[in-house]
């Protein structure tokens, strides 16, 4: 078996890369757990001080200025959002215009005859040119064969999102940050044809073309969608500032602003937000654990040489023939230990549970090792 110094000399590039992955994964995990802690404490603080508005006459005498409140009801839009060139007019929080252009697209197919892809010459590639609807300009100046495959340099009509100036729930206006959270877009379909004869309407899509079924390069098509139609019921949690709903800032500086469709109670809104936070946290936990796992995998040989030197850790040393299982356990333990450090000061019980879970593989293998020595 090679010595530790020899292994380091022969594997230092991959070992260094593994250390970088491990540090990145550990940092990401610590940041994610800290964010989860602060978000949970922010939700607890907001829930403890919230007032659910009932829109009664008596509430006008209650001092709600600066308080976090819960509103639930149909939204009202002051002025309609319009696209006059397409005879579109509707009362909604947002109206999104998505513009696509019919363009040339290049696809290169490599023919590898034994050389690596990086050394393959241009004469061993085949270039295909097709026409597709694209949201962004495809720069045809970079094409291998530019002759007859020229795209326009810009969009004559740009994609855009209109936001209503005044939106209300009851007598309270929704601030800009609240309106920004309306992102549940629905496709807008209309039977009213534009007055411009150069614009065709087909299956709810507007075409700037002579022939919908045979478009030419440079032709446009526009798709419209909306979010927050007037009359739809939404539940919002935020702070009242004057007559406007804005984000509530907790004592730790964490903004709380919740927007969910439907007539939901305070408990239902916070339950949905807590569930969304948990899913988001677990996604980043997986990313952090994956980085740590690959970092450990890059250093399998070095870790084995280190672990075999310590009797209580020898059982954790990755098997050189089947290292994946050992690496999974090591990454699992390290990830949970890092998460426990972030939680233990704010939620000691959760932190202690994570720490015990992280130490469980070590305790299990150590117990088996002690039992094995007793049998000897």
Swiss-Prot record:
It is found in: Endoplasmic reticulum membrane; Nucleus envelope. GO terms for biological process: lipid metabolic process; nuclear membrane organization. Coiled coil: none annotated. GO terms for cellular component: endoplasmic reticulum membrane; nuclear envelope; nuclear inner membrane. Changing residue 333 to L: No effect on protein stability, turnover rate or subcellular localization. Larval or pupal lethal with increased lipid droplet size in fat bodies when ubiquitously overexpressed. InterPro entries: TMEM43_fam. Keywords: Endoplasmic reticulum, Membrane, Nucleus, Transmembrane, Transmembrane helix. Residues 32-277 are lumenal. Disruption phenotype: Viable, fertile and no developmental defects until 5 weeks of age. Its main location: endoplasmic reticulum. Disulfide bonds: none annotated. The chain crosses the membrane at residues 11-31, 278-298, 324-344, 345-365. Residues 1-10, 299-323, 366-376 are cytoplasmic. The keyword Magnesium does not apply. It holds the Pfam family TMEM43. It is a multi-pass membrane protein. Involved in lipid metabolism and utilization. Belongs to the TMEM43 family. This is Transmembrane protein 43 homolog.
């Amino acid at each position: 078996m090679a010595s530790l110094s020899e292994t380091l000399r022969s594997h230092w590039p991959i070992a260094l890369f593994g250390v970088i992955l491990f540090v990145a994964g550990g940092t990401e995990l610590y940041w994610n757990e800290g964010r989860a802690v602060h978000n949970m404490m922010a939700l607890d603080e907001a829930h403890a001080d919230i007032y659910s508005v009932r829109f009664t006459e008596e509430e006008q005498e209650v001092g709600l200025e600066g308080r976090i409140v819960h509103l639930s009801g149909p939204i009202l839009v002051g002025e309609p959002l319009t696209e006059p060139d397409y005879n579109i007019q509707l009362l909604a929080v947002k109206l999104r215009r998505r513009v696509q252009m019919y363009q040339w697209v290049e696809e290169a197919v490599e023919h590898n005859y034994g050389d690596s892809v990086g050394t393959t010459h241009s004469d061993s590639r085949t270039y295909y040119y097709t026409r597709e609807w694209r949201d962004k300009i495809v720069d045809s100046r970079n094409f291998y064969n530019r002759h007859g495959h020229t795209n326009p340099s810009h969009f004559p009509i740009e994609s855009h999102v209109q936001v209503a100036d005044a939106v209300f729930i009851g007598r309270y206006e929704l601030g800009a940050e609240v309106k920004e959270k309306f992102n549940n877009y629905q496709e807008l379909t209309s039977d009213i044809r534009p007055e411009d004869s150069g614009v065709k309407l087909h299956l709810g899509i507007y075409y700037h073309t002579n022939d919908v079924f045979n478009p030419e390069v440079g032709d446009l098509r526009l798709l419209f969608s909306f979010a927050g139609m007037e009359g739809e019921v939404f539940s919002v949690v935020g702070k009242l500032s004057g007559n406007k709903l804005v984000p509530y800032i907790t004592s730790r500086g964490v903004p709380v602003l919740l927007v969910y469709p439907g007539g939901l109670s305070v408990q239902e809104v916070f339950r949905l937000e807590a569930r969304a936070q948990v899913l988001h946290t677990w996604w980043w936990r997986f990313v952090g654990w994956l980085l740590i796992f690959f970092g450990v995998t890059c250093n399998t040989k070095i870790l084995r040489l280190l672990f075999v030197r310590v009797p209580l850790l020898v059982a954790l040393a990755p098997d050189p023939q089947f290292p994946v299982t050992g690496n999974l356990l090591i990454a699992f333990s390290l990830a949970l230990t890092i998460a426990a450090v972030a939680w233990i000061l704010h939620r000691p019980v959760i932190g202690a549970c994570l720490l015990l879970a992280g130490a469980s593989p070590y305790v299990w293998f150590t117990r088996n090792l002690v039992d094995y020595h007793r049998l000897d």
